[in-house]
């Protein structure tokens, strides 16, 4: 039996993630009280049914160690993944404004504004986020995009083995929150300053030809591949579900996209489970 515990910020997409898991055949329970988690899991352990439960801020005990302790104990007995849904404040404010729903922490006697409730929830959930096996940032994603992201990550994990995620990004949009390793490639020659190349992306052949003229680009590509190859056996031995490698340049359009695609394909050709994402390209395509 596999257990996925879904948690994260209110408005970040926990309900969407749970619906995706239900479509994938998981038996899903929404907002299960933490003190019932251990008993519930053991009551259905013999069914061999994969299970997903969501836990939100209303059900998290004041002493968070009660939850993290339960999760750590379950991990010694079962295949447990803690999925944490994250999003930036701007996205959460926009979603609450669109749905006109009240934040859970604004209910009751606390009388917190939406902004205060989001900040307070972030503070409470930080230790749980540190225990997460998989963090998905839904900032700027549509319902369909988030559903596909959850589906890809879960289906990749169900095939067993480490899933390698390579994502390009632009530093001007901020660091990705789910990265295990971040490589800054802003020091490499920039095709942006070539007028004929500026409209293209790192997926286009002229950009590849430009970058491959420079030994610094080829050397960095080789060194990143070698670094990952060196430590990959130990990462796999550590029973990790995912390894997320983020490569960033200024705008996330040329250098980072080229290197992310090339390095991702390198490991895919070696038989690894690989997912490649170009976050800034996807962001700009929607605008």
Swiss-Prot record:
MF GO annotations: ATP binding; GTP binding
Keywords: ATP-binding, GTP-binding, Nucleotide-binding
Sections of the chain in a coiled coil: none
InterPro entries, sorted: P-loop_NTPase (IPR027417), RapZ-like (IPR005337), RapZ-like_N (IPR053930), RapZ_C (IPR053931)
Disulfide bonds: none
Domain of life per record: Bacteria
Annotated residues for binding of ATP: 8-15
Pfam family, one: RapZ-like_N
Binding annotation for GTP: 56-59
Family: Belongs to the RapZ-like family.
HAMAP family on file: RapZ_like (MF_00636)
Function according to Swiss-Prot or TrEMBL: Displays ATPase and GTPase activities.
PANTHER family attached to this UniProt entry: RNASE ADAPTER PROTEIN RAPZ (PTHR30448:SF0)
Record-given protein name: Nucleotide-binding protein VP2673
Species, as recorded: Vibrio parahaemolyticus serotype O3:K6 (strain RIMD 2210633)
């Amino acid at each position: 039996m596999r257990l996925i515990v879904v948690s994260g910020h209110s408005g970040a997409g926990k309900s969407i993630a749970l619906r995706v898991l239900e479509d994938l055949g998981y038996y899903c329970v929404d907002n299960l009280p933490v003190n019932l988690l251990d008993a519930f899991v053991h009551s259905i352990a013999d069914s061999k049914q994969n299970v997903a439960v969501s836990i939100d801020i209303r059900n998290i005990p004041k002493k968070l160690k009660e939850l993290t302790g339960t999760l750590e104990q379950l991990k010694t007995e079962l295949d447990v993944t803690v999925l944490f849904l994250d999003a930036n404040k701007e996205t959460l404010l926009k979603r609450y404004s669109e749905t006109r729903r009240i934040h859970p922490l604004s209910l009751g006697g606390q009388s917190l504004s939406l902004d205060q409730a989001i900040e307070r929830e972030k503070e409470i959930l930080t230790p749980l986020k540190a225990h997460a096996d998989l963090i998905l940032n839904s900032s700027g994603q549509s319902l369909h995009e988030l559903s596909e992201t959850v589906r890809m990550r879960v289906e990749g994990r169900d095939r067993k083995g480490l899933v390698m995620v390579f994502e390009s990004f632009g530093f001007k949009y901020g660091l990705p929150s789910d990265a295990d390793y971040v490589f800054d490639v802003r020091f490499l020659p920039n095709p942006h300053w070539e007028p004929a190349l500026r409209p293209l992306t790192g997926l286009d052949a002229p950009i590849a030809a430009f970058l491959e003229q420079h030994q610094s680009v080829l050397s960095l590509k080789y060194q990143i591949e070698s670094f990952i190859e060196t430590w990959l056996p130990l990462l796999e031995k550590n029973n990790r579900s995912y390894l997320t490698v983020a490569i960033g340049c200024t705008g996330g359009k040329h250098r980072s996209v080229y290197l992310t695609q090339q390095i991702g394909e390198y490991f895919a050709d070696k038989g690894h489970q690989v997912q490649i994402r170009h976050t800034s390209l996807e962001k700009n395509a929607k605008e």
